[in-house]
Amino acid sequence: MMGKETPSLRPVELPIQPVGFQDRYKVIHKICEALEKVAYPRVKLAKFAVSLELKLAKESKTSQLYRFNVGILLRDIVKFKANVYKLKIANKPLVPQKVNGRSHTAPITTKQEVFTRLRELLIDKETLRKNGYILPDVKYEPQQPVSSHVTCVRCGTKFSKEDIMNSVVCKFHPSKKLYDKSTKLEIYPCCGESTSSVSFLRLGCSTQKHHVYKGETYSELCTIANFLTTDLIDGKENVLALDCEMGFTTMGYEMVRLTIVDFFTSKTLYDEIIRPIGEVIDLNTQFSGVREEDILYAKDYEDVMEDVLRADMINRNSILIGHGLENDLNVMRLFHTRILDTAIMYSVGRFKNSLKNLSFEILSRKIQLGEHDSSQDAIAAMDIIKAKNGISITQTDW
């Protein structure tokens, strides 16, 4: 038994969980006990236990199946002395079997092999459209009337855009609700309240002085700036990971930071704070890391787009990588269709896994522990694709 509480022994949140948090928490401790019995290295024990339980939770569709798989795993940890090549979860090998000392998926070591593989993974336009991407080959009507009334994306109150700077009480939950399959309740991770709670916190655990909104349709997005396209920008094929931080203004949802990372060298090619077009309401500093003093002398939207839309950066042949990249391209007001979106590629059924969870599950890397770092997020999405496709994460000389 582990002598004292280990802060890292917490289950990773999932959109749908086979059992409740407490049950998953107890299982992690049982796995730790089993690993200790076979003298598993203590320095790696906590991380390994959490990753094993996460795989159990993802592979088990019901609470009964979860408990069955837990029993098998605990037995096998002791039986095989935690040999990862012999352990199975839901009858699937923990580590893929190898042939002649190499895994079934041969590692990709040349630039040409990388391009070939990534081209095969490009998401088709219909899938992009279904996932909220604004596409250039769809006829939109920017002159279509845009409503003067919008719904607050935080509290759900309908309000007039003209009143956006009026002081109000906007109560909301900063975290998205998660469904707990064992209790059949929707829980807000930010405060632990459920949607069926009678507590006053049910309406929200955070308060702001202004309502805020996001433009969703092409017409609404064009009220800030018209869309640009990469179609006319010729250049060599390249692969770029991209991430934007966004803030709320009087004109909606705007880009306040843009980071671009090169796939092959992992170097940050561009990282700029951006002065939004509308008057700032909330820069989402808690998540974006951008503060009001940062934007005083920052570049404006037009200058930034002029910087990045060029032959040697974002061009018509670029493969862009990100997580939920439709949000980034929408705030950039950019048409582009050569996309690798980890939120789509590695979703669980109709539920999209968070970048934070994917990063921990696939890379054993913890991100977004405090203020979001757009370079960290861009690199995480890029490395997930590398790890899933036999491309070295550490190789920088191609």
Curated annotation (Swiss-Prot):
<comment type="function">
    <text>3' to 5' exoribonuclease required for proper 3' end maturation of MRP RNA and of the U5L snRNA.</text>
</comment>
<dbReference type="GO" id="GO:0005634">
    <property type="term" value="C:nucleus"/>
</dbReference>
<dbReference type="GO" id="GO:0034476">
    <property type="term" value="P:U5 snRNA 3'-end processing"/>
</dbReference>
<dbReference type="InterPro" id="IPR047021">
    <property type="entry name" value="REXO1/3/4-like"/>
</dbReference>
<keyword id="KW-0269">Exonuclease</keyword>
<dbReference type="InterPro" id="IPR012337">
    <property type="entry name" value="RNaseH-like_sf"/>
</dbReference>
<dbReference type="InterPro" id="IPR034922">
    <property type="entry name" value="REX1-like_exo"/>
</dbReference>
<dbReference type="InterPro" id="IPR036397">
    <property type="entry name" value="RNaseH_sf"/>
</dbReference>
<dbReference type="GO" id="GO:0005737">
    <property type="term" value="C:cytoplasm"/>
</dbReference>
<keyword id="KW-0378">Hydrolase</keyword>
<feature type="domain" description="Exonuclease">
    <location>
        <begin position="239"/>
        <end position="385"/>
    </location>
</feature>
<keyword id="KW-0963">Cytoplasm</keyword>
<dbReference type="InterPro" id="IPR013520">
    <property type="entry name" value="Exonuclease_RNaseT/DNA_pol3"/>
</dbReference>
<protein>
    <recommendedName>
        <fullName>RNA exonuclease 3</fullName>
        <ecNumber>3.1.-.-</ecNumber>
    </recommendedName>
</protein>
<comment type="similarity">
    <text>Belongs to the REXO1/REXO3 family.</text>
</comment>
<dbReference type="GO" id="GO:0000467">
    <property type="term" value="P:exonucleolytic trimming to generate mature 3'-end of 5.8S rRNA from tricistronic rRNA transcript (SSU-rRNA, 5.8S rRNA, LSU-rRNA)"/>
</dbReference>
<dbReference type="GO" id="GO:0003676">
    <property type="term" value="F:nucleic acid binding"/>
</dbReference>
<keyword id="KW-0540">Nuclease</keyword>
<keyword id="KW-0698">rRNA processing</keyword>
<dbReference type="GO" id="GO:0043628">
    <property type="term" value="P:regulatory ncRNA 3'-end processing"/>
</dbReference>
<keyword id="KW-0539">Nucleus</keyword>
<dbReference type="GO" id="GO:0000175">
    <property type="term" value="F:3'-5'-RNA exonuclease activity"/>
</dbReference>
